[in-house]
Regions:
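Conserved beta-alpha-beta core of the PfkB/ribokinase-like small-molecule kinase fold
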Residues: 159-231, 247-248
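Active-site metal-binding loops of divalent metal-dependent hydrolases
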Residues: 33, 157, 186, 276
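Conserved N-terminal subdomain of the carbohydrate kinase-like
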Residues: 71-154
Length: 329
């Protein structure tokens, strides 16, 4: 691949022209939805306080797209409990269709506690052994909804266990058969896997059905066993976005590589930044009204530039959904 040096450019005008499409939904996503308990200082006796935030990578991607004016839908599960009610109301508030987000009477809503270091980087502790998002069955996957969507998105947390693993596989294959653009974010979370080896194996299984992938430098190293993006393209991926924290991101497309440096941000919390990055890129791709065959390298670079900017700005606020900048509109 050739390397192209690209510098961040803010365009004064970005076309928001919508293209009339036969399909009802712009993006449908399947996967985890959970409560993130994020630090909120300490109380009067010095104990750490936490506040609840809606979380889950697929949800963050959809929230970003919905903020950009796109029509979105979410396939997933929450418990029939107070955290689940909070998440449903949050999804509705984001403008995401939640008719396919189901309540599970047998399992609780998944919870995660987040710790932030002085750079805003995170550590997670999950309460998910009986989390509802692990119990997505094939019957929960609405194939007509997927067929009525331009883009289908999924992540790797629904691949950790059955029955969600099988259901995700069914959904992805349905999307591919229906001509959806399939997007994927491996989003590796070590506490949720038995071993890095099992994670790498499972996260690579559905690559032949993926059109666009977003992953970190570390995730790429793990999945490809050091072979890099060539491994992804050999599997059938067509466009790769490789993020590298405060170093920026690299677009790999049509035999070329373009690196976009990160913006200078006053980072306090990186939660959801990668999801917002991908949500921005995919939103721009959809609004352009092209498919990957027609997408030019220049347009892909422009989308990546905007994604780097929006995701960088999001790290200046706490929480994922709350930090999605109005700039995306």
């Amino acid at each position: 691949m050739k390397n192209i040096n690209v510098y961040y450019i803010i365009k004064s005008k970005i076309s928001l022209k919508r293209v009339t499409a036969v399909r009802k939904y712009d993006i449908t996503a399947l996967g985890e939805i959970l409560i993130d308990f994020v630090p909120d200082g300490v109380d009067s006796v010095g104990d750490m306080r936490f506040i609840r935030k809606a979380g889950g990578a697929p949800l963050n991607v959809l929230a970003t797209a919905a903020r950009a004016g796109l029509k979105t839908a979410f396939i997933g599960k929450v418990g029939n409990d107070l955290p689940g009610e909070f998440l449903i109301e949050t999804v509705k508030g984001c403008g995401i269709d939640c008719n396919y987000l189901k309540k599970d009477n047998e399992h609780n809503t998944t919870l995660a506690f987040v710790e932030l270091d002085n750079k805003g980087d995170r550590k997670f502790s999950f309460y998910r052994t009986y989390g509802a998002d692990r119990f997505i069955y094939e019957s929960d996957v609405d194939k007509k909804l997927i067929a009525d969507s331009k883009v289908f998105h999924f992540g790797s947390l629904s691949l950790t266990d059955e029955p969600s693993y099988f259901s995700t596989e069914i959904a992805v294959k349905t999307a591919k058969d229906c001509g959806c653009t399939v997007t994927y974010d491996p989003n590796y979370r070590p506490p949720l896997w038995d071993s890095p080896e099992k994670a790498a194996e499972r996260m690579a299984v559905l690559l032949p059905y993926v059109d666009i992938i977003k992953l970190s430098v570390e995730e790429l190293e793990m999945i490809s066993e050091g072979r890099g993006t060539e491994f992804l393209f050999e599997k059938g991926v067509r466009l790769a976005l490789v993020t590298d924290g405060d170093k920026g991101a690299t677009l790999c497309f049509k035999g070329e590589k373009a690196h976009i440096p990160a913006i200078k941000a006053k980072t306090v919390d990186t939660t959801g930044a990668g999801d917002i990055f991908l949500g921005t890129f995919v939103s721009e791709f959809i609004k352009k009204g092209e498919n990957l065959d027609e997408l030019s390298l220049d347009d892909a670079i422009n989308f990546t530039q905007k994604a780097v900017f929006i995701s960088g700005k999001s790290t200046e606020k706490y929480g994922a959904i709350a930090s999605i900048s109005d700039v995306i509109i």
